[in-house]
């Protein structure tokens, strides 16, 4: 993207990406993962463990959703880092990366409360430029892209 010797600013890097397309990809993959976790919740949870404390839980659905998201993003953006709550990761050197919380609100998910979502964001040099949150229980979708505003269920 950049000629030899040029050191682009973060703003120039933002301009190199179609943030609307990044937003659409975040919506799509978060929607796929939301369907996966809702179906798993309806089938009943069997794989639940704790992380750092008794109230910091992770389910098999968290892991499965993160794997799905990583797989899809890897197909669309080979080699681009994905930083996830369950599997971790890092984005050395900046540039484009994805940040994922496969089930934001796992305790609510575990106890059958509808207040949880799948969160996916694209970042450039650590600054969020596009993202989506899908709430499986209601089907609501929050989405945003830098310079294009934000919406909930299509309403700004």
Functional labels for PLM-detected ranges:
Residues 2-103:
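N-terminal subdomain of lithium-sensitive/metallo-dependent phosphomonoesterases centered on the IMPase/IPPase/PAP
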Residues 155-156:
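Conserved beta-loop-beta connector loops within the AMP-binding
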